[in-house]
């Protein structure tokens, strides 16, 4: 796998997609940058990043065995790896805020954006992208955002941080499940581990639906397909949502 550090770049994910468009990428790659100027998250949200303070990281995996039906496994594997990696640095109170954020307490410290490329209804390649807030201290009216430095009161060497990340990717065999028949993966254990780290699980939260309506309920679980199950307040039945239908109000 080739590893490339980029200087100032709009988005490491977008850079990879441009290479794909031009058919100039034909093997697995890692691209990373400390100066991403136009990072994006799910639903087109912008990831605000000061130069040389944070890490933008994208992995390109060609010809994976993950299929469309089980593609949420990509998110599960990525989220659990990042939790494990940040735990190495003793970041406290880590959890996964469905569908694509990593939290420390009630503060977002990492966003994930995984993208698939299709060919004849099959996944031809995967871009696994995430950004970790490391040394940034100002988040411009983003009250729920934070960084490792703000949380631990420590300054981090970005180069060393990235070296440890890449080393752990290899040591933990992170890439293996993407090239393994998904039917042979222990999906029950994966989703159980994911739910054990689910942000505000079993707690009453407020949610905004895609039609603008607000409702309140307890987060129960996420299933292997990425569906969030919520028990509505004062009711015993579950309501199920995909990531485009609902947003948690922190």
Where are these regions (language model features)?
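Long, positively charged amphipathic alpha-helical accessory segments at protein N-termini or as interdomain linkers
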Residues: 5, 64-69, 73-94, 104-250
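Conserved active-site carboxylates
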Residues: 101
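N-terminal lobe of the biotin/lipoate ligase/transferase fold
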Residues: 1-89, 110, 117
């Amino acid at each position: 796998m080739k590893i490339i550090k980029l200087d100032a770049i709009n988005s490491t994910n977008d850079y990879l997609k441009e290479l794909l468009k031009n058919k100039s990428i034909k093997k697995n790659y890692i691209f990373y940058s400390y100066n991403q100027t136009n990072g994006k998250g799910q639903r087109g949200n912008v990831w605000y990043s000061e130069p040389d303070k944070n890490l933008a990281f994208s992995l390109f995996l060609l010809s994976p065995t993950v299929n469309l039906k089980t593609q949420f496994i990509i998110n599960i594997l990525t989220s659990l790896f990042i939790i494990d990696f940040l735990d190495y640095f003793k970041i406290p109170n880590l959890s996964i805020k469905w569908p694509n954020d990593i939290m420390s307490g009630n503060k977002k410290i990492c966003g994930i954006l995984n993208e698939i490329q299709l060919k004849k209804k099959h996944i031809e390649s995967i871009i696994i992208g995430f950004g970790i807030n490391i040394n940034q201290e100002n988040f411009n009216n983003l009250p729920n955002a934070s960084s490792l430095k703000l949380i631990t009161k420590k300054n981090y060497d970005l180069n060393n941080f990235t070296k440890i990340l890449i080393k752990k990717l290899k040591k933990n065999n992170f890439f293996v499940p993407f090239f393994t028949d998904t039917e042979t993966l222990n999906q029950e254990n994966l989703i159980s581990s994911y739910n054990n780290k689910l942000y505000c699980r079993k707690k009453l939260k407020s949610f905004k639906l895609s039609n603008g309506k607000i409702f309140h309920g307890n987060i129960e679980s996420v299933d292997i397909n990425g569906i969030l199950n919520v028990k509505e307040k004062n009711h015993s039945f579950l309501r199920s949502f995909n990531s485009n239908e609902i947003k948690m109000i922190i």
